[in-house]
A protein has these predicted regions:
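Conserved beta-strand hairpin/beta-sheet module of binuclear metal-dependent hydrolase folds
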Residues: 1-42, 122-141, 158
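Structured catalytic core of nucleotide-sugar glycosyltransferases
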Residues: 4-14, 55-65, 69-70, 83-87, ...
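Active-site neighborhood of phospho(di)ester-bond hydrolases with catalytic His/Asp-centered motifs
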Residues: 26-29, 49-57, 77-80, 137-141, ...
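Active-site metal-binding motif and surrounding structural segment of the metallo-beta-lactamase
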Residues: 32-78, 157
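Active-site environment of divalent metal-dependent phosphoester hydrolases
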Residues: 58-62, 83-85, 120, 144-147, ...
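Metallo-beta-lactamase
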Residues: 78-133
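Cap/insert and terminal regions of metallo-dependent hydrolase folds
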Residues: 147-246
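Acidic, low-complexity intrinsically disordered tails
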Residues: 256-273
């Protein structure tokens, strides 16, 4: 299994998951031309992607999916609520599912789980490679972590986890109180502190890659988020590679497989665009 974060942040999110000849995209929050550019940077064509899963209807996750699906003949999956919240998904005949459903997509089995966010029916995903059993969890856009997540996201090989803001920077930042409340609220975005608390519960010795995602450019910094996470997991068994995804760069590949329990940092790319 290989995972690339094509970009992550308030201006656009997209994550490519590949295993056994199957390629799927989790979100397509960039215009189709930008998606093509980012895919091209890692030698992937849009036509080689079989399907896309939209986690929720907010623009930074869905912006390019309709045009990309038409251009590259993707099958698009989204929760029933997400389709209702973004009617253009109906125009491309997006296939609905209920949060909690498992999608069987070629060599990948993708479990969906409802997230606490202010979308209509938002989801996170766990993709499992049929051949190797490798598991990748992609969790962003959530204001808090439900207790059930510890079970859902255990024994992962790759974890892409939101670490959106530093709480002090959010309070001191440029946003009005209403926006601060939305971002920091129970249905907003996960702070560095809350991300660390969750990671401390679910990381383990076999987790090869921990990737921090959806970092705010105004209320966070990669070095702050990484330091906070390192402190949070310092006394756990985690011995994998920790990194921060970027809004402006393609990051990856993050790899896992039957015998891959330690990441090879030299194999990862950070391609500025």
């Amino acid at each position: 299994m290989r995972v690339w974060v094509l970009g992550s942040g308030s201006a656009g999110n997209a994550v490519l998951v590949e295993s056994g000849g199957t390629r799927i995209l989790i979100d397509a929050g960039f215009p189709v031309r930008e998606l093509a550019k980012r895919l091209g940077a890692i030698g992937v064509s849009g036509e080689s992607i079989e399907s896309a899963i939209v986690t929720h209807e907010h623009t930074d996750h869905v912006r390019g999916v309709c045009a990309a699906a038409k251009k590259w003949k993707w099958t698009v999956y989204a929760s029933t609520g997400t389709i209702a919240g973004h009617p253009l998904l109906e125009d491309i005949c997006a296939r609905p599912f209920a949060a909690g459903a498992t999608l069987e997509l070629g060599a990948l089995s993708v479990e969906t789980v409802r997230t606490p966010h202010d979308g209509t029916e938002p989801v996170a995903v766990v993709a499992t490679a049929r051949l190797t059993g490798a598991r990748a969890g992609i969790i962003y856009d959530l204001g808090h972590v439900p207790a059930s997540y510890r079970k859902t996201f255990e024994r992962l090989d790759i974890l892409v986890l939101e670490s959106n803001h530093d709480e002090g920077m959010l309070r001191a930042g440029p946003y009005p109180p209403s926006v601060q409340s939305r971002i920091g609220g129970a249905y907003g975005h996960l702070s560095n502190r809350r991300a660390g608390a969750f990671a401390r519960e679910c990381v383990h010795a076999g987790l090869a890659q921990l990737v921090l995602a959806h970092l705010s450019e105004r209320c966070n910094r990669p070095e702050i988020a990484l330091r906070s996470m390192r402190d949070a997991v310092a006394r756990t068994s985690f011995r994998g590679v920790m990194s921060a995804a970027s809004q402006r760069a393609v990051c990856g590949p993050f790899t896992a497989g039957r015998n891959t329990r330690a990441a090879v940092a030299a194999s990862q790319l950070s391609l500025e665009l």
